[in-house]
Curated annotation (Swiss-Prot):
Disulfide bonds: none annotated. Keywords: Cell inner membrane, Cell membrane, Ion channel, Ion transport, Membrane, Metal-binding, Sodium, Transmembrane, Transmembrane helix, Transport. Fluoride-specific ion channel. Important for reducing fluoride concentration in the cell, thus reducing its toxicity. The chain crosses the membrane at residues 3-23, 39-59, 67-87, 102-122. Its main location: membrane. This is Fluoride-specific ion channel FluC. GO terms for biological process: cellular detoxification of fluoride; fluoride transmembrane transport.
Length: 130
């Protein structure tokens, strides 16, 4: 039996729990900001660092595929998908695919924010939940 999906699911549960824990541990006041999503910010930065570190080890075959699926796809995927975005962008830059990297980075941010805004608008105005 192939346990790939089980490894990813188990890692995802751990990563999601860690994200919740980190988010709850962080204060909402940060530096000069009265309300700053420090938990999400911290999770994204930590996740990017860890996926960079683990991504390099994966390329060098320091650990097996099952552990990579468990940790990178599962734990980090549950912790933050922003880390995958960072790794994908870095891979494009490393291959000197600069136009693709910039397009991906800008497109992800602009279209992601646009998607959130449209979803919010539709829920507010058409579902009737104000």
């Amino acid at each position: 039996m192939n346990f790939v999906f089980l490894w990813a699911a188990l890692g995802g549960a751990i990563g999601s729990s860690l994200r919740y824990f980190v988010g709850k541990m962080m204060p909402s006041k940060f530096l000069m900001f009265e309300s700053f999503p420090l938990g999400t910010f911290s999770v994204n930065i930590i996740g990017c660092f860890v996926i960079g570190f683990m991504g390099h080890l994966a390329v060098k075959k320091v650990f097996g595929d099952d552990f990579g699926i468990f940790f990178v796809t599962g734990v980090l995927g549950g912790f933050t998908t922003f880390s995958s975005y960072g790794l994908d962008t870095l891979k494009l830059l490393q291959k000197s695919q600069y136009i693709e990297a910039v397009s991906y980075a800008l497109g992800t941010n602009i279209l992601g924010l646009t998607g959130v805004a449209i979803g919010w608008f539709l829920a507010k105005n058409f579902v009737g939940i104000h």
